[in-house]
């Protein structure tokens, strides 16, 4: 099956968003260490919101990025 240009762009954009999301998750891994001096619940909620990005209604065309605590 041949894909349209729009479908291909959507795939590329989706991968770009996932790459950014994964980078943000990796950068915030340290916040989940038991003795990290941060609000772990707030950071856990932020990290869950990052994981949920692909479930947003307009993904990948419009993405609302969560704000770091």
Regions of interest found by a model, annotated:
Residues 1-69:
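A preference for well-ordered globular domain cores
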């Amino acid at each position: 099956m041949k894909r349209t240009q729009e479908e291909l762009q959507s795939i590329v954009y989706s991968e770009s968003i996932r790459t950014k999301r994964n980078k943000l998750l990796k950068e915030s891994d340290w916040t989940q260490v038991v003795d990290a001096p941060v609000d772990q619940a707030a950071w856990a909620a932020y990290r869950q919101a990052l994981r949920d990005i692909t479930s947003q209604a307009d993904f990948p065309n419009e993405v609302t990025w969560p704000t770091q605590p």
